[in-house]
Amino acid sequence: SAFQTADAAICAAAVADYTPATPADHKLKKANERLDRIELVETVDILAELSRQKGKRCVIGFAAETDNVVEYAERKLARKGCDAIIANDVSRADSGFGTDTNKAWIVSTTGTQELPVLTKPQLADTILDLLQNL
């Protein structure tokens, strides 16, 4: 994978937490096949897997939270084994999905830093600065 030759990985979103246990090999037609339920299985946790393989490389993950933002990010950091979590408070009108700004905290193995409300490009620059210091 590309991570083998990378200096760092920034995992900005979970690709999918679950996937169908038995994917269909054809389009399911509404008229022909009744779909009562879809059995799901957990997918590989990419952030945790990259963190296990990181060696001296840096791995940063994200957490979109609506409450207990820092506490949940600290738990995620410990659980995943990455170098830092960028925790976004998506309960705010000026942060997260569908906005141009984010209210975030950097939660790392060396401590927690609350950031002001930043534009997404400003937050990206802050994350790149963080990478240089990890």
Sequence positions of predicted segments:
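Small-residue (G/A/S/T)-rich helix-start motifs and N-terminal tracts that mark the onset
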Residues: S1-A8, C82, D89, D94-L134
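Glycine-rich phosphate/dinucleotide-binding loop and adjoining beta-alpha-beta core of small-molecule
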Residues: S1-D94, W105
